[in-house]
A protein has these predicted regions:
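Thiol-based oxidoreductase modules, predominantly thioredoxin-like and allied folds used
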Residues: 64-78
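Bacterial N-terminal signal peptides that target proteins for export
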Residues: 1-8
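Non-catalytic, surface beta->alpha helical segment in thiol-disulfide oxidoreductase systems
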Residues: 97-140
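Structural alpha/beta surface segment adjacent to cysteine/selenocysteine redox centers
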Residues: 79-109
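Second-shell loop/turn segments in exported
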Residues: 40-46, 69-70, 81, 118-128
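C-terminal motif of bacterial Sec signal peptides marking the signal peptidase cleavage site
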Residues: 15-19
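Bacterial signal peptide processing site
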Residues: 21-23
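Local sequence-structure signature of Cys/Sec-based thiol-disulfide redox active-site neighborhoods
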Residues: 27-62
Length: 140
């Protein structure tokens, strides 16, 4: 019985580390001298990780034209970044392009905050942006 409890505890611990783990998120800019800088701050766990990876891949398509920096809310650097922009609470992801997170796209104010459209969870709602919106801003 005691061994069974230990196995259960270690299994739950391993699952928790897998869900919240991954690479530490506080990466330096890919191209710090690029005219366009994309800064992403996100929670480093499963529900949002795929959106962060999509943003990272999109920024990489622009090569040296776009710098990309990623911050983790759970690091000192991430906390400082969040404080700089007044982000608090349970924010899955916020994206800043040259220090701005809201842009007008086709006459509509679009804020790169929270999950992309249709990407939310039962706990956190989707945002109002799409990857196509992000591409539109980066193309300008």
């Amino acid at each position: 019985m005691q061994n069974t409890k230990l196995i259960i505890v270690f299994t739950l611990l391993a699952l928790a580390l897998t869900a919240c783990g991954g690479a530490p998120v506080a990466l330096p800019s890919t191209y710090p001298d690029a005219a366009v800088q994309v800064e992403v701050i996100a929670l480093n766990h499963a529900p949002i990780r795929s959106a962060v990876e999509e943003v990272e891949a999109l920024a990489a398509e622009y090569g040296e034209k776009v710098g990309y920096t990623r911050y983790d809310f759970d690091t000192d650097v991430g906390v400082a970044f969040a404080e700089k922009y007044g982000i608090d609470g349970h924010t899955p992801i916020a994206i800043y392009i040259n220090g701005e997170d809201e842009f007008e796209i086709d006459g509509v104010a679009t804020k790169f905050y929270s999950f992309p459209q249709d990407g939310g969870t039962g706990i956190v709602a989707s945002g109002t942006w799409t990857m196509d919106d992000l591409r539109t801003v980066l193309d300008q």
